[in-house]
């Protein structure tokens, strides 16, 4: 049976279906479209809100899988502004710890986090992504992280190179090619500390497990922690300063 005929039959059957059946149909077919529209609206709303308050967001970081209060997030944003020497009261730094991200795409909240990252990256509102290595692996191999050599100064590269974490660009390319063909590319995340075992190693994240600032964000660190620079950033100077800020004693 032609696809269009099947679609027409489904639509006809839905006319007399219960609300629950109709809702399940809608959710199965349109949930990602719905998430996309919602996050675009959220991005627009945030822009309108900050504009109406006369404020400008000069830095935005997302840290995954932690549950901190808004007060903590605001204080950390203010502390970073002070560190960066930004004294304009109309400029704000936002730290967002409200999202969960895991390599297991079936876990609750993962879809929302990925949609938020996608939307805020495409609208140049996202600067830094941080969290457990499992979360950052997702960002690495979804193509959301910059090659650190493109952003960090030569001096910073010398200082932080011992903490660099690498992704394999060859795997990312194969994954993206498969996506273009609507195919699923299955792979195992390579060890990011062993670029010598990769086909095309690229430094895209920094191990921040021992940074005191990360220990405040994650009071009970039991795994490797990392941060990477969003490919959507237009605040490169502030991003460089934030990396230094995280490593401050």
Residue locations for each model-derived region?
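N-terminal targeting leaders characterized by basic, low-complexity, disordered sequences
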Residues: 1-4
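Short, membrane-interfacial amphipathic segments enriched in basic
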Residues: 8-20
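Aromatic- and glycine-rich beta-strand/loop motifs that create alpha-glucan
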Residues: 20-29
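Hydrophobic membrane-insertion alpha-helices, especially the h-region
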Residues: 29-51
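Early extracytoplasmic/lumenal segment of secretory-pathway proteins
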Residues: 54-133
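Extracytoplasmic "Venus flytrap"/periplasmic binding protein-like
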Residues: 106, 111-196
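A bilobed periplasmic-binding-protein/Venus flytrap-type ligand-binding module shared by bacterial periplasmic
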Residues: 220-235
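Short amphipathic alpha-helical coupling segments at ligand-binding clamshell hinges
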Residues: 234-245
């Amino acid at each position: 049976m032609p696809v269009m005929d099947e679609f027409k039959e489904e639509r006809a059957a839905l006319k007399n279906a219960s609300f629950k059946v109709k809702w399940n149909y809608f959710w199965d077919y349109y949930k990602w479209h719905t998430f996309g529209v919602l996050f675009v609206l959220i991005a627009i709303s945030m822009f309108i809100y900050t504009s109406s308050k006369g404020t400008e967001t000069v830095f935005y970081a997302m840290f995954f899988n932690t549950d901190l209060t808004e007060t903590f997030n605001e204080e950390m944003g203010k502390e970073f502004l002070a560190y960066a020497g930004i004294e304009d009261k109309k400029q704000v730094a936002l730290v967002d710890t409200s999202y969960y991200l895991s390599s297991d795409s079936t876990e609750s909240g993962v879809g929302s986090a990925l949609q938020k990252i996608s939307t805020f990256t495409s609208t140049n509102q996202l600067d830094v992504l941080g969290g457990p290595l499992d979360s950052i692996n997702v960002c690495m191999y979804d193509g959301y992280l910059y090659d650190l050599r493109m952003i960090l100064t030569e001096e910073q590269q010398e200082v932080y190179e011992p903490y660099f974490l690498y992704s394999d660009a060859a795997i990312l390319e194969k994954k993206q090619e498969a996506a273009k063909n609507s195919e699923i590319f299955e792979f195992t995340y390579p060890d990011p500390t062993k670029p010598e075992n990769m086909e095309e190693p690229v430094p895209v994240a920094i191990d921040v497990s021992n940074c005191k600032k990360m220990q405040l964000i994650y009071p009970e660190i039991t795994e490797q922690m990392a941060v990477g620079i969003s490919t959507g950033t237009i605040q490169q100077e502030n991003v460089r300063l934030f990396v230094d800020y995280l490593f401050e004693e």
